[in-house]
UniProtKB/Swiss-Prot annotation:
PROSITE patterns, per the entry: CNMP_BINDING_3 (PS50042)
Reactions listed under catalytic activity: NAD(+) + H2O = ADP-D-ribose + nicotinamide + H(+)
Keyword Membrane: no
Entry's EC annotation: 3.2.2.5
Protein name: Pycsar effector protein XpPycTIR
Source organism (scientific name): Xanthomonas perforans
CDD domains (UniProt xref): CAP_ED (cd00038)
Gene coding for it: pycTIR
Induction cue: In E.coli strain MG1655 transformed with both genes NAD(+) levels fall dramatically by 10 minutes after infection with phage T7 (at protein level).
Length: 303
């Protein structure tokens, strides 16, 4: 691809392409100067030419191809011919690179040193204004990717109807903690409107998930009877564990009941609890709540 921009004819094509870039803004003299001082290079797909955290300071003009901009490994933007990357280094060369840039496909670039770029911008001062406008636009793009910080961490607690007294105890135990514990019965799922859409919305809003296991049903295996969890609780917990990960999805199981758990939950760290009806119920379940509180506070809000 780079051959198209080499030689006399290629140089003419290169100047014409660069003239249309946003920062150049149809100034052929500026385009010719950047071509003269810059290095024409080809970056194969998948090769990083700007690394986040590096102290390099070159500015790159995309002539052909497509690149991804990644921050902490996450793709935050794509850039195309007509765009440039690395301009922040021209404004403050002492700062490390704020993002990595990786070609999605074979890409042709013009690399211009910070010194040469700054000298060209001094000759054409409106370049600085265009850089400011470009960075303002990109900041607005980045803001769309930032999730508003909730005032409190949100913990979603799910259970069967039979286990609701246990859930009530958990909600009471966490009433004064710096996180919000929400039970499925409290306006999350309405019996007449139980849909996966509602469940998905709760997945997005929650930082942690807690499933209270209870011997609701009996499973007969090889003539043996085992207490087991309701299928809907397993479904809900599986979805939360898939979205939040094992560090943010906790299964509470009764200490004195040998529950038959699905094989998919094998190896999951569980929190045993004791539930004894009566005036001492809170005291019996307090150790399990203390362990759960410790895990939640240690992990904090999700990213």
């Amino acid at each position: 691809m780079i051959e198209r921009f080499q030689g006399d004819e290629g140089r003419r094509r290169l100047v014409a392409t660069l003239t249309e870039h946003r920062l150049v803004a149809n100034r052929q003299e500026l385009a010719e100067r950047l071509v003269a001082v810059g290095e024409l290079m080809e970056a194969p797909a998948g090769t990083t030419f700007i690394n986040q955290g590096d102290q390099t300071s070159e500015v790159f003009f995309i002539i052909a191809g497509k690149v991804e901009v990644r921050v902490n490994g996450k793709v935050v933007a794509n850039r195309f011919p007509g765009d440039s990357v690395g301009e922040m280094a021209a404004i403050e060369p002492s700062q490390p690179r704020a993002a990595s840039v990786i070609p999605v496909e074979d890409t042709v670039l013009i690399k211009v040193s910070e010194a040469e770029f700054s000298a060209a911008a001094e000759q054409f001062p409106d370049v600085w204004r265009r850089i400011a406008a470009t960075l303002a636009r990109r900041l607005a793009e980045r803001n769309h990717l930032v999730t508003a910080q909730r005032e409190r961490v949100r913990v979603f607690i799910m259970s069967s109807v039979e286990a609701l007294p246990i859930v009530d105890l958990l909600i009471k135990q966490f009433a004064h903690d710096p996180f919000l514990a929400v039970a499925w019965k409290n306006g999350v799922f309405r019996a007449s409107q139980y849909t996966l859409d509602e469940l998905e919305a709760e997945l997005d809003d929650s930082d942690f998930a807690v499933a209270v296991a209870h011997g609701d049903d009996v499973l007969i295996t090889r003539d043996d009877e085992w207490p087991t969890i309701r299928d809907n609780v397993i479904l809900e917990f599986g979805l939360f564990m898939g979205r939040l990960g094992r560090r943010r999805a906790f299964l509470m199981e009764p200490r004195d009941v040998d529950l038959k758990l699905p094989s998919d939950l094998a190896g999951l760290t569980t929190i045993p609890y004791r539930y004894v009806k009566g005036k001492d119920a809170e005291h019996y379940i307090a150790p399990a709540c203390a362990r759960l509180r410790e895990l939640i506070l240690a992990a904090g809000a999700k990213d």
